[in-house]
């Protein structure tokens, strides 16, 4: 049996909860509050106690509405016969008549209501007129107060404002009282309203009771079935249970087959939603019941109705568009819930550092919440968007029983990986390649002459000053085999170029003049070759000269670690004369022999990789780079990344200036098609397509820029004073333009090494190519001069330089550039002065002149005293004052100087405390040349 609470009974009866609680206590029930629950039978008993007794059923209640209606229509006489009839008739037939009378709806007197509304409207119009008149009077009062002004006017305004507010409040209170009376009157006239809340509560209580009753019955059935099954299992043997289970399974299969053959009739779904209840009729005369009084204008009411209708239409449209509100869907059966599929775990998991929990869950087909729970059990607090390190991911995979492997990400912008990867070359495709030989040595020891002899050309005569300015790469054929030669400059400024030549070479030919012997650049070349473990072949040149001494050269080289094979070393020595082509064949045979011992191999089938030998900017071709192919084959139209630049090989020429389409291993070629000129010594690599090459080149340029920005020097305690001292130095700003990148580097390094105390060189800009207008503009803005090395300014740049007074210095020999720069730096130094004493004098007499000062009469005892010299006043061996002369006279004449043994008078500027026997020392400051 279901139970009811007292407040539910009160709602059903339309009574207050207090009355129901009191009545329950009167009936002897043990209840404490309106929340107490009672059985349904007790609830019915409480409800019956509120109903009237059966005997006095017929009362004046049914006649009450008639009486009230008669009062409205002013007909009160017919009420008496009705009562008399009711009293005269017996009790049984009276009851149905009273029920019929109570069920009749009350009739409304619409005419009286219309008259009442018209009367109210007339009163409101009258009140509005009065309000308008009051507002007009207030405006006139304000105007008068403005004219009057002063404190009296202000007090009058305050009094009137107070009176107006009081009148307004009285009027509002009066209108509120009238509205309350009208509402009471209408409520008496209106039909009784239906209590929808009470009905809804009763319906809900009935549904709850029914649900509780059915639930209790189902629970009892379940308990009974459970007990019966338990008793049956106790009595039966296991074998019997299995037999019964098998029979039940067969019956279930048969039933399932029948169900599949005969489709089940689907009953229409019952709409359990509560139907929308109709709203009660609302009295339309209450819309203007506001404290501010009268209705608004008809125009405003129409606009409000329009907005309200628009909102209602929008709400209805949205309601129609909502899924599930369609009437056609109400009778459809709900779709069955599909079970989640079970996914097997993978056997392997490839991960990267920084993977999030959500990414891991997606890869292993598990929910992120499950992984978060596992991590929590492992002691790791994480969310599904949190990144995990490699160690945590591996521990998580161990928990799942999955083998974890870290994914190796390949950096597409890393060119160096092609040079170190073991799997890049195919071992089966390796073939013999030509050796790359670098010719190194001191200045003017005959390197270029030797290379010229090898190529049977006169390259050396075209070199300015007799020295090689940049690397040349050439290829010759000896006994059917190719040899690639690299010529490096021997001047001290080209150290970086020699280092690059040694890094890409297979064999080094060290040229040493037999008459000069070992020189500084010779030692440097030996160190470069040993640093990269390159075998050295010593070519002792100029043996045709009278002062040649090859044995001395061999001994000097032995002191620096280069031992001849005849002395038990590993270096080959060949005595040659490059000028007269003596023993050149023997030198080439030695080169091929050493190359054969080294077993030089290359794979021509892979994409080409190599090193930049030189780079320059050509006005017609753009960026031109000389490349040495080390592995693979370079073709025209190959997408290529060179250092921090990229492009496509547009054209390719060999060392003879002829166009070629293919360049194999150990072949030097010049290419065009790059977006910028690369740096000498950069590596290059051919990519699969132009898109990947562009991405790699842009990424490398971006990284180089970031690295350059981060390379700012930080001031530490050790270099703080050096930094402060450097701020006081004078600076010579220079812009360098050269024909090739190697010359630019050599010039920059040489100029920055110039040591002149108090002056430093600042390289504002350095680049490859001709001097153009932008260089001149930059020089003018930075107060710099331009140094051109083997380049010339354009006509427009020359005109602009003359107009802007920018100095351009052109050179073809690096010695001249360095000497000229040293002179310019010394010329910027402040002159140094040295003090020189020119004479001494002794004060013999002093004269004080008013408004003039103290005049000292003196005699020169040594040298002279000049008018423009500085003087010191020395008293008892101590310098009292150091200053300048204000005047110098010999008797009454102004003179420029007073010589030894003569007398004169002097005045010292700013000093009047001259005394007898003071020594006046005259001196001048002379400039000293640096």
Curated annotation (Swiss-Prot):
Q: Where is this region: G3?
A: 487-490
Q: Where is this region: Disordered?
A: 50-195, 260-346
Q: Where is this region: G1?
A: 441-448
Q: Which HAMAP family match?
A: IF_2_B
Q: What is its main location?
A: cytoplasm
Claim: Cell membrane is one of the keywords in the record: no
Write out the biased-composition intervals (Low complexity).
Answer: 50-67, 129-141, 309-318
Q: What is this protein called?
A: Translation initiation factor IF-2
Function as written in the Swiss-Prot or TrEMBL entry: One of the essential components for the initiation of protein synthesis. Protects formylmethionyl-tRNA from spontaneous hydrolysis and promotes its binding to the 30S ribosomal subunits. Also involved in the hydrolysis of GTP during the formation of the 70S ribosomal complex.
UniProt-listed InterPro entries: EF-G-like_DII, IF2_II, IF2_N, P-loop_NTPase, Small_GTP-bd, T_Tr_GTP-bd_dom, TF_IF2_bacterial-like, TIF_IF2
**Name of the coding gene:** infB
Q: Looking at the record, which segments are called G5?
A: 577-579
- Which family is this sequence assigned to? Belongs to the TRAFAC class translation factor GTPase superfamily. Classic translation factor GTPase family. IF-2 subfamily.
Q: Does the keyword Transferase apply?
A: no
Q: Which is a Pfam family this sequence falls into? A: IF2_N
Q: Where is this region: G2?
A: 466-470
Report residue spans for region: G4. 541-544
| NCBIfam families assigned to the protein according to its UniProt record, in alphabetical order | IF-2, small_GTP
Q: Where does GTP bind?
A: 441-448, 487-491, 541-544
Biased composition, Basic and acidic residues: where in the chain?
68-90, 110-125, 157-167, 262-295, 337-346
Q: Which GO terms describe its cellular component?
A: cytosol
Native organism: Streptococcus pneumoniae (strain Hungary19A-6)
A molecular function (GO) term: GTP binding
């Amino acid at each position: 049996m279901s139970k009811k609470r007292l407040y539910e009974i009160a709602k059903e009866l339309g009574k207050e909860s207090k009355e129901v609680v009191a009545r329950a206590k009167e009936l002897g029930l043990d209840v404490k509050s309106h929340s107490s629950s009672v059985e349904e039978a007790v609830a019915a008993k409480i409800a019956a106690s509120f109903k009237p007794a059966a005997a006095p059923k017929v009362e004046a209640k049914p006649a009450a509405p008639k009486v009230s209606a008669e009062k409205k229509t002013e007909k009160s006489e017919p009420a008496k016969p009705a009562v008399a009839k009711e009293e005269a008739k017996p009790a049984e037939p009276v009851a149905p008549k009273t029920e019929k009378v109570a069920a009749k709806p009350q009739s409304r007197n619409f005419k009286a209501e219309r008259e009442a509304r018209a009367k109210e409207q007339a009163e409101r119009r009258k009140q509005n007129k009065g309000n308008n008149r009051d507002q007009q009077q207030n405006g006139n009062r304000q105007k008068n107060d403005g004219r009057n002004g002063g404190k009296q006017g202000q007090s009058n305004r305050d009094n009137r404002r107070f009176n107006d507010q009081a009148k307004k409040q009285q009027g509002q209170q009066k209108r509120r009282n009238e509205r309350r009376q009208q509402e009471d009157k209408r409520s008496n006239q209106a039909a009784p309203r239906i209590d929808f809340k009470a009905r809804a509560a009763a319906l809900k209580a009935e549904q709850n009771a029914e649900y509780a009753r059915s639930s209790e019955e189902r629970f009892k059935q379940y308990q009974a079935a459970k007990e019966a099954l338990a008793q049956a299992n106790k009595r039966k043997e296991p074998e019997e249970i299995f037999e019964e289970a098998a029979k039940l399974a067969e019956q279930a299969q048969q039933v399932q087959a029948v169900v599949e053959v005969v489709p089940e009739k689907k009953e229409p779904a019952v709409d359990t939603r509560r139907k929308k209840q109709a709203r009660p009729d609302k009295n339309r005369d209450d819309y203007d019941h506001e404290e501010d009084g009268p209705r608004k204008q008809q125009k405003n009411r129409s606009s409000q109705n329009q907005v309200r209708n628009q909102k209602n239409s929008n709400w209805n449209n949205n309601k129609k568009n909502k899924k599930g509100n369609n009437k056609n869907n109400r009778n459809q059966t709900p779709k069955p819930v599909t079970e989640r599929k079970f996914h097997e775990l993978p056997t392997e998991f490839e991960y990267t550092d920084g993977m999030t929990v959500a990414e891991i869950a997606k890869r292993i087909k598990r929910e992120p919440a499950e992984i978060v729970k596992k991590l929590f059990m492992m002691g790791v607090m994480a969310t599904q968007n949190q990144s995990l390190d490699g160690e945590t991911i591996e521990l998580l995979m161990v928990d799942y029983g999955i083998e974890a492997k870290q994914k190796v990400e390949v950096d597409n912008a890393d060119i160096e990986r092609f040079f170190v990867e073991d799997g890049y070359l195919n071992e089966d495709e390796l073939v013999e390649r030509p050796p790359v030989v670098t010719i190194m040595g001191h200045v003017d020891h005959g390197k270029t002459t030797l290379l010229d002899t090898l190529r049977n050309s006169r390259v050396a005569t075209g070199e300015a000053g007799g020295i090689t300015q940049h690397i040349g790469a050439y290829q010759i054929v000896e006994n059917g085999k190719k040899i690639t030669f690299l010529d490096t400059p021997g001047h001290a400024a080209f150290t970086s170029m020699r280092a690059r030549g040694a890094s890409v070479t297979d064999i080094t030919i060290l040229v040493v003049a037999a008459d000069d012997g070992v020189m500084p650049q010779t030692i440097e070349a030996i160190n470069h070759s040993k640093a990269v473990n390159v075998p050295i072949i010593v070519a002792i040149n100029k043996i045709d000269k009278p002062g040649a001494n090859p044995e001395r050269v061999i001994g000097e080289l032995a002191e620096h670690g280069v031992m001849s094979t005849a002395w038990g070393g590993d270096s080959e020595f060949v005595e040659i004369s490059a000028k007269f082509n003596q023993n050149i064949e023997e030198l080439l045979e030695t080169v091929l022999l050493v190359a054969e011992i080294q077993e030089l191999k290359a794979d021509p089938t892979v994409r080409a990789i190599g090193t930049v030998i030189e780079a320059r900017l050509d006005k017609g071709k753009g960026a031109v780079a000389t490349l040495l192919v080390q592995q693979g084959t370079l073709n025209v139209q190959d997408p290529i990344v060179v250092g921090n630049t990229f492009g496509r090989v547009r054209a390719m020429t060999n060392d003879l200036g002829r166009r070629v389409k293919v360049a194999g291993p150990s072949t030097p070629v010049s290419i065009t098609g790059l977006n910028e000129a690369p740096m000498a010594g950069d590596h290059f690599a051919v990519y699969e397509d132009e898109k990947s090459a562009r991405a790699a080149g842009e990424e490398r340029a971006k990284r180089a820029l970031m690295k350059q920005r981060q390379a700012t020097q930080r001031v530490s305690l050790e270099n703080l004073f050096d930094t402060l001292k450097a701020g006081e130095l004078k600076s010579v700003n220079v812009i360098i333009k050269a024909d090739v990148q190697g010359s630019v580097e050599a010039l920059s390094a040489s100029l920055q090494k110039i040591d002149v105390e108090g002056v430093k060189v600042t390289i504002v800009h350095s680049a490859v190519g001709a001097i153009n207008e932008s260089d001149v503009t930059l020089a003018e803005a930075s107060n710099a001069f331009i140094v051109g090395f083997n380049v010339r300014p354009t006509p427009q740049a020359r005109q602009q330089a003359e107009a802007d007074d920018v100095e351009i210095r052109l050179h073809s020999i690096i010695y001249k550039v360095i000497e000229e720069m040293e002179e310019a730096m010394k010329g910027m130094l402040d002159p140094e002065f040295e003090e020189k004493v020119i004479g001494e004098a002794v004060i013999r007499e002093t004269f004080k002149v008013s408004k003039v000062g103290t005049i000292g009469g003196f005699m020169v005892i040594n040298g002279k005293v000049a008018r423009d010299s500085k003087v010191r006043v020395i008293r008892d061996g101590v310098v009292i004052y150091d200053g300048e002369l204000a005047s110098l006279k010999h008797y009454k004449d102004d003179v420029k100087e007073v010589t030894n043994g003569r007398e004169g008078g002097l005045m010292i500027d700013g000093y009047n405390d001259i005394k007898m026997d003071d020594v006046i020392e005259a001196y001048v400051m002379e400039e000293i040349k640096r």
